[in-house]
């Protein structure tokens, strides 16, 4: 995967994910810092006139779902599931939010989403390199498994009960749905609670990454 966003390149470099760097000799403080780090780490730097500053990084390595579950259990933490979310920028923004609030990991469906691309990496501000990300075949089955392990499970939906009216206990898992399709019915059926974020304006919903932030902040308050 080729990255052109300097912030994402720096985060990938610090995590040892950069294979090589390309540039045409342009300099600014951020690029100079990245080049210095690359030299110290022994990352090859290729200079070519007209070449946009970029970095080739190794593919995102997905974590095992069981690893994230164990991490949430032992740390009394929470997991973010993204159901029917296909826009790479939204995926990246949600991953950034999850990492910021200390989630044990993020879970994506194997179908429809595909692999994480540059748009998600950029929107995550490099958070994709700092938080475990897993992919599973069936969200409903995964949620069912978590319930048996003692997780509180939540699905976000406009027709749900108010978030503030629900008693939240950790470990927990929250499922955020795509803006077009939302959380699928089988997944909602498996969750302990179907909840919404109450608002007072004329617009009846939030961008999914904003909604994810509110849910995860609420859960993080139970832990920290």
Curated annotation (Swiss-Prot):
Supply the Gene3D superfamilies for this chain: 3.40.1280.10
Q: E.C. number, please?
A: 2.1.1.-
Give the record's GO biological process terms.
methylation; RNA processing
Top-rank EC class of the record's enzyme: transferase
Q: Its GO CC terms?
A: cytosol
An example Pfam family from this entry, by short name, is SpoU_methylase
- Which residues does S-adenosyl-L-methionine bind? 177, 197, 206
Q: Keywords in UniProt for this one?
A: Methyltransferase, Transferase
MF-aspect GO terms: RNA binding; RNA methyltransferase activity
Q: Does the keyword Membrane apply?
A: no
Note the InterPro entries from the entry. Answer: Alpha/beta_knot_MTases (IPR029028), rRNA_MeTrfase_TrmH (IPR004441), SpoU_MeTrfase (IPR001537), tRNA_m1G_MTases_N (IPR029026)
Q: Which protein family is named in the record?
A: Belongs to the class IV-like SAM-binding methyltransferase superfamily. RNA methyltransferase TrmH family.
PANTHER family tied to this protein? 23S RRNA (GUANOSINE-2'-O-)-METHYLTRANSFERASE RLMB
**Per its record, how is this protein called by name?**
Uncharacterized tRNA/rRNA methyltransferase AF_2399
Q: What is the originating organism of this protein?
A: Archaeoglobus fulgidus (strain ATCC 49558 / DSM 4304 / JCM 9628 / NBRC 100126 / VC-16)
């Amino acid at each position: 995967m080729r990255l052109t966003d300097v912030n994402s390149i720096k985060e990938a470099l610090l995590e040892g994910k950069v294979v090589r760097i390309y540039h045409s000799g342009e300099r600014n403080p951020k690029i100079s810092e990245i080049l210095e780090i690359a030299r110290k780490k022994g990352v090859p730097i290729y200079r070519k006139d007209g070449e946009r500053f970029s970095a080739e990084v190794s593919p995102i390595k997905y974590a095992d779902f069981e690893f994230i579950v164990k991490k949430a259990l032992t740390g009394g933490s929470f997991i973010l599931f993204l159901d029917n979310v296909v826009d790479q920028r939204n995926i990246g923004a949600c991953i950034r939010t999850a990492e910021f609030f200390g989630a044990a990991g993020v879970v994506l469906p194997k179908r429809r989403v595909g692999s994480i691309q540059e748009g998600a990496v950029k929107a995550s501000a490099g958070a994709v390199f700092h938080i475990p990300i897993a992919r599973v075949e069936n969200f409903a089955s995964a949620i069912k498994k978590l319930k048996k392990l003692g997780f509180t499970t939540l699905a976000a939906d406009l027709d749900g009960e108010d978030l503030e009216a629900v008693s939240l206990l950790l470990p927990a898992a929250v499922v955020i749905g795509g803006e077009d399709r939302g959380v699928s019915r089988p997944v909602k059926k498996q969750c302990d609670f179907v909840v919404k974020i109450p608002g007072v304006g004329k617009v009846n919903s939030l961008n999914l990454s904003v909604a994810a932030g509110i849910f995860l902040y609420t859960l993080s308050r139970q832990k920290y």
